[in-house]
């Protein structure tokens, strides 16, 4: 079956550059092969600058009835975590929903949103998996490679592997292990709430990933960058900031 994913229009390119690591017009089997190749390119070493100035969160929402996706990127200033910029794009989702291949379905929207940024983030937190993925390259790793930027996977659910339940105290965590390999951490970010699943995306180690997620938590289960992006992608822009509406930029993509 020949499933075609979108190509981004090159005019949507201001601050962030996208590495052309592969074609987006691929079959499912080709997507698997691309993931296996990209997994070897993921850096598990920390390359986050000592004090990031800007941290971005990205997420996507889906209107299943219309097959429409809304991708959002919200950039915050560190350490106050106040919103600096919000970009949102909407378009039809061409690639099917296949667990483990969500990056081929969702990444084009996120990339288009990132390409419209005026501010370049030093770190991106992704609502999804990094190397905590069967082929060790979830959407956080995929985006990190494409954007050549440190990324962290901050998932709300576990895709693969197993872990012990972390203690109830905030900052407690247990390792996620799959086939004998540590691929992430089940991290308690809020007392009384389920842990989130943190993993290396690209250009970061697990210890640093956990540290920065905790630095960006402000009493909610999710770190502020991905929490804001989740709200923005769902159309709840006013919930994240009274002035965020002015920063909203909804674009109907022109696709090749």
Language-model features: locations:
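C-terminal binding/interaction regions
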Residues: 17-23, 27-42, 107, 170-255
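Two-metal-ion RNase H-like nuclease active-site motif
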Residues: 53-63
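A short acidic-Thr-Gly-centered motif at the start of a beta-strand
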Residues: 42-51
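A glycine-rich, hydrophobic loop/mini-helix early in the fold
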Residues: 65-120
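A contiguous pocket-lining binding segment that forms or flanks enzyme active sites
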Residues: 133-183
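Catalytic-site beta-strand/loop segments enriched in glycine and acidic/polar residues
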Residues: 110-141, 147-149
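Extreme N-terminal basic, low-complexity initiation segments
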Residues: 2-7
């Amino acid at each position: 079956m020949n499933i075609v994913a979108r190509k981004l229009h090159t005019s949507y390119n201001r601050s962030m550059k996208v590495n052309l690591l592969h074609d987006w017009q691929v079959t499912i089997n080709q997507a698997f092969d691309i993931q296996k190749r990209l997994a070897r390119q993921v850096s598990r070493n920390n390359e986050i600058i000592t004090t990031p100035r800007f941290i971005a969160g990205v997420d996507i929402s889906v209107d299943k009835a219309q097959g429409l996706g809304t991708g959002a990127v919200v950039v915050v200033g560190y350490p106050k975590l106040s919103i600096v910029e919000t970009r949102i794009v909407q378009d039809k989702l061409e690639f099917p929903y296949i667990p483990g291949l969500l990056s081929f379905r969702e990444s084009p929207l996120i990339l288009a949103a990132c390409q419209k940024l005026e501010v370049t983030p030093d770190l991106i937190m992704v609502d999804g998996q990094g190397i905590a993925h069967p082929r060790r390259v979830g959407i956080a790793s995929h985006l990190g490679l494409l954007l050549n930027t440190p990324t962290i996977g901050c998932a709300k659910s576990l895709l693969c592997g197993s872990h012990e339940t972390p203690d109830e105290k905030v900052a407690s965590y247990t390792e996620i292990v799959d086939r004998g390999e540590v691929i992430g951490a089940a991290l308690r970010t809020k007392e009384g709430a389920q842990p989130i699943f943190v993993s290396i995306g690209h250009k970061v180690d697990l210890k640093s990933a956990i540290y920065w997620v905790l630095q960006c938590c402000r009493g909610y289960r999710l770190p502020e960058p991905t929490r804001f992006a989740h709200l923005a992608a769902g159309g709840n822009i006013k919930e994240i900031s009274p002035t965020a509406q002015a920063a909203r930029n909804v674009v109907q993509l022109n696709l090749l």
